[in-house]
Amino acid sequence: MTGDNEPGQAVMQAPFTKLNALVPASGLFRLADGTALPYRAWMPADMPKDGPWAVVLALHGMNDSRDAWEYPAPVLAAAGIAVIAPDQRGFGASPSRGYWSGGEAMARDAAAMLRLLRQRYPHSRIFAMGESMGGAVLMLTATLHDAPAVDGYILSAPALWGRSKMNIALRSTLWLALHTIPGARLGPGPVRVKASDNRIALIRLGHDPLTIHKTRVDVIGGVVDLMDQALESAPYVKGPALFLYGAHDELVPKRAMHTAWAALARERGADDNVEVRFAYYPDGYHLLLRDQRRDLPMQDVIAWMMGIAGGRNDIPLPSGADHDAIARLRAAQGR
């Protein structure tokens, strides 16, 4: 690791100057169909001539943007890891802001961006990290027949709340809205969830000019389709992969996450369970990497990446969050 900061210490102060700051993009990903996706980059201060030891493509969640990584990215950069965080299609400052492009299209965008990073940094380890919707997108990317060559996936609370895990009233309401008012834009409504215990991070998300506050019904339907696809693809995710989940997640139900984790574990069997790792945080919320205790998952992510770079995927995580993670998640479902 480079620098004097231990993982987690570099983000104790808010990593932005103003709550409503519009930070210019660092550059553009130009994709094969002509789409240009803006990205922010956080680079290590002391970078070797042949590039950083690792590069992370970081994908944000629904209605979020490239700014989703303002808290974790400086910590990764302090550890010598470059973070490249694009606005996904339909979000942030992308050309199709506010409209849904399809989960498969987004998965292929991610694959294309990972290949571009591999070309640009041929001597670096390439990782893909996704939060919430971004994690679901990467689960599809990992199961493409021509999936890009990456060194590992980090999936923080991937969005897996598909129709099969919704009650019939919610499924029926969504079906009716999609067939009657698909273009209507909906606000957050009366129901409030606590996405993180970091109040400043939530205020920043609400004031960020790149955040979308009113969502088209058909975009909601598209995200649910994506979650269905991600849940179905779970047994076939090609590792190495690290799944992160917090006990206080109010957006992705424990039952849905346990279904995915259990399917992955069954697919690989007891003798190959280190290919995909699971970490369960008793104090964590949905936005784990922005939480007050984000130092714990950040330490784990960096340690896991360093283990992969050293040819090991079986080193215990520093926080101990991987100890009996599936069993602890299963036990917590009824609480």
Could you tell me what each predicted segment is?
Residues 237, 243-245, 249:
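Short beta-strand/loop motif that positions the catalytic acidic residue
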Residues 51-61:
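Short beta-strand element of the alpha/beta-hydrolase
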